Amino acid sequence: KKNSKKISNKLNKIISEINETKTYDNKTTIIIKRLLQKELPERLRKKICRKIFNENFRTSEKKIAKEFYLNLSEIKTIKRYGNEIGSHSFNHLWMNSLNSKKQLSEIKKSLQFWKKNKLINKKWSFCYPYGGYHRTCIKNLKKLGCSAAFLVQNKVNKINEFKKFELNRVDCNQIKF
């Protein structure tokens, strides 16, 4: 009974956030994404995702990832053509759902990868996964030498409202193709 009330509260919270979310996903899709991204316990999320994957794909996660995600060589090519590479955390978790220690771990692991592969500059940026952050995350980014961080607000940045750790960016899910 206690768990069902907790889940009900989470669903109500997600539903109230949906009205503020500007995306082309329908409400059901947004609810399912939020549950699988952060609201359910991590072990349960992984179990559900693995089951969904195995029921819908007749290949390994590794093969899917190889086909749909950039590999190191492709990322180096992007960098060579003058693009900046920033951090986005290591496991793509909602930063506002993590404590300070876990945030630092996520950011540091990501930076280690980028530095090891010579893909990040001294002045590096960070993009909050899903746009989720809080003040502790900003403090941690500053502590690690980050120069700027991006939200998912689907807005234009205004010079008179410039906050370098709360810069707007457009999420690809907010663009109709």
Describe the predicted segments one by one.
Residues 1, 6, 97-177:
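C-terminal active-site subregion of NodB/CE4 polysaccharide deacetylases
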Residues 67-84, 91-119:
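Alpha-helical scaffold elements lining the catalytic groove of polysaccharide deacetylases
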Residues 84-86, 166:
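Short hydrophobic-acidic sequence motifs that mark active-site Asp/Glu residues
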